[in-house]
């Protein structure tokens, strides 16, 4: 792994964003052997840290040119913000509405004397148990930044790599650069389709997700009823011609929800009932 990182900037200049790009590999289904790969952004701003999908920023640039609202969201990718030097995270989750959940996430690290050198950078090992999973991190003390991807922070240096012991998740730093001004994410991270995220508790969100599981195609059913059979109506790329078809589609959707239930924080997985 070749890192493209500038270590000559010991601190963030006023009103600037220092951006780190991480390669994120993960399994949505823990029983699968396939790993999905996406690039994620860690923005270190003067007063706040943000973590979100790289494609959101790319799409936002196009939206601004076209004067479009953001309607891009990937439910399998984490998105969060936190104040500088804080463990208080605000996570953004899209169900039928964009919600935000505030959590306090302190992480207890165990520092190791093990080190390794990658692309000229000296990395030190640390381990932790977080979110019901065991993690191994490699960090660099030359960068006086106690940050890292997702909620992982608090080490005496920037996290370059972190992975889960069962191979379900990993983050690897691949690039870093400085932006001239603080990068504004208010149109695509903290909002969806022009609407700001609504604050909700973890307990209430879990209940809503269980309710959604019980009737996952509710909105599509209403749309089909209102269409009165006019034109073609597709769900999951399947043409629907009668309400009875929704029974089979509902079962397929529920099966997918059960299978794709492998969150970063395993102890927060929704316990969907088997049909």
Each model region followed by its residue ranges:
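Bacterial Sec-dependent N-terminal signal peptides
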Residues: 1-20
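Glycine- and acidic-residue-rich phosphate-binding/metal-coordinating active-site segment common to enzymes
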Residues: 10, 118, 122-179
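Extracellular or lumenal secretory-pathway regions
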Residues: 16-117, 122, 136, 167-275
């Amino acid at each position: 792994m070749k890192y493209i990182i500038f270590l000559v900037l010991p601190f963030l200049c006023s009103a600037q964003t220092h951006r780190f790009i991480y390669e994120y590999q993960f399994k949505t289904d823990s029983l699968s052997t396939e790993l999905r790969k996406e690039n994620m952004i860690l923005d270190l701003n003067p007063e706040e840290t943000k973590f979100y999908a790289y494609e959101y920023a790319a799409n936002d640039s196009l939206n601004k040119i076209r004067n479009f609202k953001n309607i891009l969201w990937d439910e399998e990718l984490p998105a969060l913000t936190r104040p500088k030097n804080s463990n208080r995270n605000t996570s953004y989750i899209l169900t039928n509405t964009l919600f935000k959940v505030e959590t306090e996430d302190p992480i207890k690290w165990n520092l190791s004397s093990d080190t390794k050198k990658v692309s000229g950078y000296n990395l030190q090992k640390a381990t932790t148990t977080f979110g019901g999973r065991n993690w191994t991190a490699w960090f660099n003390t030359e960068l006086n930044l106690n940050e890292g991807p997702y909620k992982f922070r608090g080490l005496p240096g920037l996290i370059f790599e972190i992975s889960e012991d069962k191979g379900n998740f990993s983050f690897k730093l691949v690039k870093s650069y400085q932006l001239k001004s603080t990068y504004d994410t208010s149109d695509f991270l903290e909002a969806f389709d022009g609407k700001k995220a609504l604050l909700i508790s973890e307990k209430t969100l879990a209940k809503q997700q269980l309710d959604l599981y019980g009737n996952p195609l509710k909105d599509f059913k209403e749309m089909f009823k209102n269409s009165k059979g006019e034109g073609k109506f597709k769900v999951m790329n399947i043409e629907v011609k009668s309400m009875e078809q929704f029974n089979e589609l509902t079962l397929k959707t529920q099966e997918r929800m059960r299978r794709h239930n492998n969150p970063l924080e395993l102890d927060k997985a929704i316990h969907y009932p088997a049909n």
